[in-house]
């Protein structure tokens, strides 16, 4: 797995690259340029107080990325899957154009393409709406990930709503026909899309969340059960954990979409219990949670 980005050539960036390598990611696709890394600052919420993010990304190395700066043909020469995030298109028009460049080359070279819609309202500041920019780019996607509000902002699909209050809540299953219509609408708007994933979250408080997930593929809806996370540690990165788990699941269980979906949600649920952006859990831990091991006992 290769991580592709643009970073300044300085000690801070080198330390970040070392961290990526320590977590098993290839970094040969990283190019150097610009003068600073983008930052974000997180004010963690508690109880009824929401978390808040402040972005400091204007003028960063990635925000000033332009087409032609990355040798996509070289990067894709031995690749089979290209995953991209809507955040990459949110920072600037040049960044959106670089996304299109990558997608066109990945498409021409026959890669599977997946997209995390990743709508971040605070980042779209260059005069274009997310829908205006993202809708043409999403058309290249074989696999799409997102939450209901993101599908609404980018594709205009009205949310069904996930209001479960505990793991035994029956309203989720009662709404499955509506979620099936939701998935069908995604495929209508993005004909190339073979699999549309929807991660669902109901926040009771900042530290108490319920999670579930849905997959629409081949005119069929698949769904998980509900995870009730009452003592959340850090939800930042849980969506990325879901996407990473889903890609891993689709590759590892190519003939079992249900198992891949369960793996993705278990990975995301575990990330809610881990502090920081990275999901520092093992495959065995995810599989254990999939099998119903939720005791939290010490493993000796």
Spans of model-derived segments:
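Conserved N-terminal subdomain of the carbohydrate kinase-like
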Residues: 2-87, 115, 286-300
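Active-site flanking residues adjacent to catalytic metal/cofactor-binding acidic residues
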Residues: 5, 115-117, 146, 239
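Anion (oxyanion) recognition and catalysis
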Residues: 21, 100, 104-108, 138
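Flexible, glycine/proline-enriched loop segments at strand-loop-helix junctions
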Residues: 56-59, 84-94, 119-124, 169-173
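Charged helix-capping and loop-helix junction motifs
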Residues: 69, 96-101, 127-135
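Short beta-strands and strand-loop turn motifs
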Residues: 81-87, 112-121, 148, 197-199
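Conserved phosphate/ATP/ADP-binding segment of small-molecule kinases
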Residues: 109, 123-220
């Amino acid at each position: 797995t290769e991580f592709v980005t643009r970073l300044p050539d300085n000690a801070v960036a080198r330390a970040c690259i070392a961290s990526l390598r320590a977590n098993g990611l290839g970094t040969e696709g990283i190019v150097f340029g610009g003068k600073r890394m983008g930052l974000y600052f997180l004010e963690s919420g508690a109880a009824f107080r929401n978390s808040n993010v402040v972005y400091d990304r204007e003028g960063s190395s990635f925000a000033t990325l332009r087409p032609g700066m990355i040798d996509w043909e070289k990067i894709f020469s031995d690749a089979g899957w290209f995953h991209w995030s809507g955040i990459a298109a949110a920072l600037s028009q040049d960044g959106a154009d670089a996304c299109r460049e990558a997608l066109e080359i990945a498409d021409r070279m026959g890669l599977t393409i997946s997209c995390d819609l990743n709508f971040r309202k605070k980042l779209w500041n260059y005069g274009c709406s997310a829908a205006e920019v993202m809708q043409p780019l999403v058309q290249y996607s074989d696999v799409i990930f997102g939450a209901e509000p993101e599908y609404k902002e980018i594709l205009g699909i009205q949310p069904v709503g996930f209001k479960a209050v505990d793991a035994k809540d029956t309203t989720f299953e009662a709404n499955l026909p509506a979620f099936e219509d939701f998935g069908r609408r995604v495929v209508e708007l993005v004909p190339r899309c073979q699999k549309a994933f929807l991660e669902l979250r109901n926040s009771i408080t900042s530290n108490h969340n319920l999670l579930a997930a849905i997959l629409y593929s081949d005119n069929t809806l698949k769904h998980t059960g509900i995870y009730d996370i009452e003592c959340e540690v850090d939800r930042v990165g849980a969506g990325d954990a879901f996407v990473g788990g889903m890609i891993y699941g689709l590759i590892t269980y190519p003939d079992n979409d249900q198992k891949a979906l369960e793996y993705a949600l278990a990975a995301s649920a575990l990330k809610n219990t881990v502090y920081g952006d990275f999901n520092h859990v093992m495959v065995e831990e995810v599989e254990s949670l999939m099998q119903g091991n939720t005791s939290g006992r010490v493993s000796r």
